[in-house]
Design a protein with these regions (language model features):
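Substrate-binding pocket helix/loop in short-chain dehydrogenase/reductase
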Residues: 1, 5-10
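Active-site helix of classical SDR
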Residues: 24, 59
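A short helix-coil junction within the Rossmann-fold of NAD(P)-dependent oxidoreductases
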Residues: 26-35
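Residue(s) in the substrate-gating loop at a strand-loop-helix junction
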Residues: 44
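Active-site-adjacent segment of SDR/Rossmann-fold oxidoreductases
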Residues: 49, 69-80
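C-terminal helical subdomain
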Residues: 83, 103-139
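Short, flexible catalytic-loop segment of classical short-chain dehydrogenase/reductase
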Residues: 86-96, 100-102
Length: 165
């Protein structure tokens, strides 16, 4: 965090937060008028269980809180909203970003189809928060049951958080 240029931090916020707010705001009036529509805001498991990237986790937590808050206000309008919180997904994202992921256990990877299927199933079921993949459902559930201090310690030790903020 402290080693990044302010412009890099702002760019992350622009993509992860500002664009979500602006696109949601742009789409809602027509959906509300039609009493129909669905919005899926892409968050991350990192928004539910803070990890190594503090600014990334914080931006995704914003998306989760924003979506949950908006869901209450949309009740009865015919418009559904969801925060999609996937874990690691097999896409070109990490490679393009130059993030080395070879040490990540295979069991933590999700396929794109798993994420899409989970998202659509949860949207149909009326779930505001969608966490695709059994492994991530377990992780987020357990993380919600243990003290935050333990999560912080695990983040420091297991996930080598030092220097990646």
């Amino acid at each position: 965090f402290w080693t990044l240029e302010p412009a890099e931090l702002q760019a992350q916020l622009d993509v992860n937060v500002t664009s979500v707010v602006q696109l949601t705001r742009a789409a809602l009036p027509a959906m509300i008028a039609a009493a129909s529509g669905s919005i899926v805001n892409v968050a991350s498991v990192a928004g539910l269980v803070p990890g190594r990237g503090s600014t990334y986790s914080a931006s995704k937590a914003y998306v989760v809180a924003f979506t949950e808050g908006l869901a209450g206000g949309l009740s009865g309008t015919g418009v559904r909203i969801q925060a999609l919180c996937p874990g690691f997904v097999h896409t070109e994202f990490h490679e393009r970003a130059g993030i080395e992921m070879s040490s990540l256990p295979k069991a933590l990877w999700l396929e794109v189809d798993q994420v899409v299927d989970g998202c659509l199933h949860d949207l149909e079921a009326g779930r505001v928060i969608s966490v695709p993949g059994l492994q991530y459902k377990v992780i987020t559930t357990v993380a919600g049951m243990v003290p935050r201090t333990l999560i912080t310690r695990l983040n420091r030790g297991l996930f080598n958080a030092r220097g990646r903020t």
